């Protein structure tokens, strides 16, 4: 996809505040400091469209951005930051469950994992939700420039085991080298293809009349 324009639309915490309209949505999820902001900024060719919070995990908002006139990019709040107050942590679960299970515009979720970190229970919970709600995941492994090839292979094996993933499901990404940018876009573009229900059908021509029996 060629990104010509990306603009912030609004923030929301509940369905009543979600943007109206029928644009498909691709959401981005991951724990705090996983590189979500860098991934989004590289994909849309912007430096500060999504900013890294100075207090990770404190902002529990779902942020909606419109990309061209094609789709909504949805930035989900980060999770897993140890210093987040308990009350904030309790808000995160119902907010995520509601969006993932009820949002009809949602086409898929880019689930972001750090190549240097072992997946957490929150990561597994997110993937479990996506599978339970039939939301297609795109698994993106970030910060790949920070490890050697051997370490990448070792960590990939751990991620696949912990998350019950296959090798072909992993998409490697580096904000520094831009490795994986095109591959991630290809996955997103595939999810944005119109579904059968959204594609106007071509009326069938009436069948030619059969032979008439006297």
Swiss-Prot record:
Species name: Geobacter sp. (strain M21)
Recorded protein name is Probable GTP-binding protein EngB
Q: What protein family is recorded?
A: Belongs to the TRAFAC class TrmE-Era-EngA-EngB-Septin-like GTPase superfamily. EngB GTPase family.
Q: Which domain of life does this protein belong to?
A: Bacteria
The residues listed in the UniProt record as binding GTP, with positions renumbered to this chain, are 30-37, 57-61, 75-78, 142-145, 173-175
User: Keywords on this record?
Assistant: Cell cycle, Cell division, GTP-binding, Magnesium, Metal-binding, Nucleotide-binding, Septation
Any single GO BP term: division septum assembly
Which InterPro entries is this protein grouped with? Answer: G_ENGB_dom, GTP-bd, GTP-bd_ribosome_bio_YsxC, P-loop_NTPase
Give a GO cellular-component term. cytosol
Role: Necessary for normal cell division and for the maintenance of normal septation.
Can you give the residue ranges of the EngB-type G domain? Answer: 22-194
Q: Which NCBIfam families match?
A: GTPase_YsxC
- Known PROSITE patterns for this protein? G_ENGB (PS51706)
List positions binding Mg(2+): 37, 59
Question: A single Gene Ontology molecular function, please?
Answer: GTP binding
The gene from which this protein is expressed is engB
Comp. bias intervals (Pro residues) = 203-214
Q: Which cofactor does it need?
A: Mg(2+)
């Amino acid at each position: 996809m060629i990104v010509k324009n990306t603009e912030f639309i609004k923030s929301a915490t509940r369905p009543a505040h979600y943007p109206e309209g029928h644009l498909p949505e691709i959401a981005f999820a991951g724990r705090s400091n996983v590189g979500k902001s860098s991934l989004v900024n590289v994909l849309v060719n912007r430096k500060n469209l999504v900013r890294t919070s100075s207090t990770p995990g404190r902002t529990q908002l779902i942020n909606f951005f419109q990309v061209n006139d094609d789709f909504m990019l949805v930035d989900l709040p980060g999770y897993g930051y140890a210093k987040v107050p308990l009350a904030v942590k309790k808000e995160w679960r119902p907010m995520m469950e509601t969006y993932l299970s009820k949002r009809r515009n949602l086409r898929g979720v880019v689930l972001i994992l750090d190549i240097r970190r072992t997946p957490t229970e929150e990561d597994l919970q997110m993937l479990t939700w996506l599978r339970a709600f039939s939301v297609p995941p795109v698994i993106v492994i970030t910060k790949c420039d920070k490890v050697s090839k051997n370490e990448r292979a070792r960590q990939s094996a751990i991620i696949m085991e912990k998350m019950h993933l296959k090798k072909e499901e992993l998409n490697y990404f580096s904000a520094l080298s831009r490795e994986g940018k095109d591959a991630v876009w290809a996955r997103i573009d595939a999810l944005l293809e119109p579904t059968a229900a959204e594609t106007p059908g071509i009326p069938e021509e009436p069948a030619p009349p059969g032979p008439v029996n006297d």
